[in-house]
Amino acid sequence: MKKKIFAMFALLLLFIPSFVFAKSYDVDEYLKLDFDDDWYVFTKSNIKDNKELEELGVSEEYMENLFKSSNVVVDAILFADDNNDTKEVFVRTTETKDLYNLNDNTDSYINEFADGFISSVKEQGIEVVNSKVYKSNNNAYVYLEYSDSNLNVIEYFTVVNGNGYAIQVQKTNSFTESEKDSFEEIIDKASFKILKQEKNDDNNKEQEKENNKSSNYVTNIIVGAIIGALVGALYGLIYTKRKAKKNKSEK
């Protein structure tokens, strides 16, 4: 009888879906991102005494240097059986004095901005394979797919509260449609605390001048700070360590 009950229970489990829970991370004072719990996610505020960093054999000092040297505020990694399918997500930020909130502008300005942004990326020698304006959750992004440093990259870029945010995922192999959808879901769930720019008469005049500037003027400054694949971050370090350990064990 007990065996029969156990068999029925085991069969029932086959039809119960497994759930992957998401956790919310504070990127900075304005942005929160959700990642499923199978991601390793590191931010400026959570690396101290972080057990997952210890598990990966990565030092707090290494992460601090990465954050300082690359305008990075988030480094998240999702391991795959095939190293070439391991995905790494970065969020990079840069100040944008000439633009406060991208989505506060007209569609024509946003499209012009996107065109200027894409042109500036191409001028960096980066091969852009797909691009568009993407709108989600009351925000506007410039969407890019490109190749750089033998890595494939998908990037969403926006400007909120006078800060440019580049949210990108990269891996060696090409992205599947399912992977693109999964990353898009992270973007769709991104939560920005959007502040309205305080304006007086002088500010209005200055803003009008800034909006009349060529989008290329604005985007050339931004692109130089946050575009391109990041080589030698978590994935590079962990892969190198694992390879060295494997070589040592084979001797």
Named regions from a protein language model:
Residues 1-5:
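Positively charged n-region of N-terminal signal peptides that target proteins for export
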Residues 9-17:
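Bacterial N-terminal signal peptides
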Residues 18-24:
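Sec/Tat signal peptide C-region and signal peptidase I cleavage site
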Residues 28-48:
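Proline-anchored loop/turn motifs at beta-strand termini and strand-loop-strand connectors
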Residues 37-41, 165-215:
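Surface-exposed amphipathic alpha-helical segments
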Residues 47-154, 165-166, 209-214, 235:
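Conserved polar/disulfide-associated segments of primarily extracytoplasmic proteins
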Residues 201-251:
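C-terminal single-pass membrane-anchor helix
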